[in-house]
Amino acid sequence: MAKGGSLYIVGIFLPIWTFMIYIFGKELFLIRKYQKIDSTYTALSQRVKEQYDTSRRRNYFPKVKLSRNSYDDYTLNYTRQNDSDSFHLRENATILMLVRNSELEGALDSMRSLEDRFNNKYHYDWTFLNDVPFDQDFIEATTSMASGKTQYALIPPEDWNRPQWINDTLFEERLRVMEDEGVLYGGSKSYRNMCRFNSGFFFRQSILDNYDYYFRVEPNVKYYCDFPYDPFRVMRLKGKKYGFVISLYEYEETIPTLWDAVEEYLVASEETILRKEDSAYAFLTDSGLVGKHYPVVEANSDYNLCHFWSNFEIGDLNFFRSDEYKHFFETLDAKGGFYYERWGDAPVHSIGVSLLLRPDEIIHFDELGYFHSPFGTCPASYAVRLDQRCRCKSDDESVIDITPHSCLMRWWKNGSGKYFLKEEQDEI
């Protein structure tokens, strides 16, 4: 009975053991199979990594340049400097921010973005301007954020405040009308002070006397890409006097008589400034078809309303200090348009540099991704975006470069042109 019982138990469990051994063997087979597949793909991945290792290290396509507006054959090699380099020669330049104490958080955001993308390698000075004294919190926080020296200056009242010759009654009336009409910043007094200061007084501040170049930065902006070069060095080596990244149309209701004042200046200065054909005058007046687009606004004067967006600008301070530019500004300022209307510093700068500089002295930094609400710019080339670790999409709705609202194509046509591809990289 016991023997028969044992046989019975064996008979019951033998199929179970056999099944378990089968399952275990099958699982072991699958594990080994997947290990083999994983090993195969690991080896393949390693070969791909080694094949494109130079791309991973951001020396992308060393024999192809997708644009050469700023880093051309005789300025900078396209291959970027190794990020591990601990020393970079600096130009005689400063990063400049006009900012209020209340804008500290926005200032820190902009500083962090520019430090990460550019200045942590160069340690350029940061210069901060304000019409009231900076408080200790602002000074401590910005000093901590900067990789270079920080310095702070109080703008003299005579450089900031509304001049005494402005008719207060007319000014208040124009302020009320523009606010009622919904003009952007139409009712703001401080905004007018800022625009006039940026147009004709920022370069007169004594704290800037020892610098040759400035890089204007505003609070709450973003720099999307690593800078592949030092833009200050490009400015010096190529003899550039003004650099921009975005160009668009101005609101005509803010500058209804600006071009009238410019035309008076042109007549009075005809013998002392560049001939129209030698300057970028056509950029300001061309209203024809460019690509698929006519100007989005039909202007009421010969001025097509195109301007360089001055919240990002890199400039030669010695140009703005020149008698030619100061005469240009003072002629316009005497009209009172900064207060009776709402003239912005962007069209004033743009008209000034377009009339007083040759087109080849103005540079479009087309590799530098940037955003200032509501518009941005992003390199169109996928390879460039990879190389510069950009965090933007060239087809994003905020990117304005070749949209109907942009004047960039008009600059390509009437300014310094645009290069799209050059096959060979010459040595410098």
From Swiss-Prot:
Positions glycosylated per UniProt: N77, N82, N92, N167, N414
Cytoplasmic side stretches: 1-3
Lumenal side: 25-428
Membrane topology reported for the UniProt record: Single-pass type II membrane protein
Residue ranges, annotated region (Catalytic): 89-428
Transmembrane stretches, start-end: 4-24
Domain of life: Eukaryota
Record-annotated disulphide pairs: none
Pfam families, alphabetized: Glyco_transf_15
Location (main, coarse): Golgi
SUPFAM superfamilies recorded: Nucleotide-diphospho-sugar transferases
Protein name: Probable mannosyltransferase YUR1
GO MF, any single term: alpha-1,2-mannosyltransferase activity
Subcellular location: Golgi apparatus membrane
Further remark: Present with 6400 molecules/cell in log phase SD medium.
Record pathway: Protein modification; protein glycosylation
Native organism taxonomy: Eukaryota, Fungi, Dikarya, Ascomycota, Saccharomycotina
Gene Ontology BP annotations: cell wall mannoprotein biosynthetic process; protein N-linked glycosylation; protein O-linked glycosylation
Family in the record: Belongs to the glycosyltransferase 15 family.
Key words, A-Z: Glycoprotein, Glycosyltransferase, Golgi apparatus, Membrane, Signal-anchor, Transferase, Transmembrane, Transmembrane helix
PANTHER family: ALPHA-1,2 MANNOSYLTRANSFERASE KTR1, MANNOSYLTRANSFERASE KTR2-RELATED
Region (Stem region) location: 25-88
InterPro entries: Glyco_trans_15, Nucleotide-diphossugar_trans
Annotated function: Possible glycosyltransferase involved in N-linked glycosylation. Transfers an alpha-D-mannosyl residue from GDP-mannose into lipid-linked oligosaccharide, forming an alpha-(1->2)-D-mannosyl-D-mannose linkage.
Catalytic residues in the record: E313 (nucleophile)
